């Protein structure tokens, strides 16, 4: 009987290990890190808080070459309760501010005071697969809009836009540090 239990436990462990990491929509991110860099699939530029110091309310989000500054890091360690795959994207240079969407197509992405606002602050990470499991679409599901870069130059605005099936809406998550 002891051998049978051991065999069943072993088979169950093997079966669980063979399930793909992203098999279920409700799983959390594959990599459990608290600080990430987010670069655009189209041009490798990083999400960037457009400031030379610490972000404040209303700081615009742009894309920029890697400068190594904390304004290009995001903290996503806090998942949104009851909303699988949703995270608050706080800026590492000042964690009092989070990425916010106000719901209009073409709205400039900004940082606003982090309030745990369930409508305008959660960002959903949608695995897009591709050649890497770290490629995601970032969406505000309340308004069905995707995080979109508008160009491949330093300071290119990042907007919330409807899905366009282009790689300017795909983002690569990387460990920072």
Regions found by a protein language model. Name each.
Residues 2-22:
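Sec-dependent N-terminal signal peptides of Gram-positive bacterial secreted proteins and lipoproteins
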Residues 24-177:
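Lectin-like carbohydrate-binding module/patch detector with strong preference for beta-trefoil
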């Amino acid at each position: 009987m002891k051998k049978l239990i051991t065999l069943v436990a072993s088979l169950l462990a093997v079966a669980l290990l063979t399930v793909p990491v992203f098999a279920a929509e409700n799983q959390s991110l594959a990599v459990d890190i608290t600080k990430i860099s987010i670069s655009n699939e189209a041009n490798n530029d990083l999400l960037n808080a457009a400031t030379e110091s610490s972000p404040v309310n209303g700081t615009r989000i742009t894309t920029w070459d890697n400068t190594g500054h904390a304004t290009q890091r995001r903290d996503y360690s806090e998942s949104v309760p009851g909303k699988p795959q949703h995270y608050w994207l706080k800026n590492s240079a000042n964690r009092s501010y989070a990425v916010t969407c106000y719901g209009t197509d073409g709205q400039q992405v900004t940082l606003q005071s982090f309030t745990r606002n369930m409508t305008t602050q959660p960002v959903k990470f949608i695995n897009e697969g591709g050649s890497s499991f770290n490629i995601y679409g970032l969406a505000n599901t309340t308004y069905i809009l995707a995080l979109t870069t508008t160009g491949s130059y330093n300071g290119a605005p990042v907007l919330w836009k409807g899905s366009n099936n282009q790689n300017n809406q795909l983002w690569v998550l990387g460990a920072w540090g």
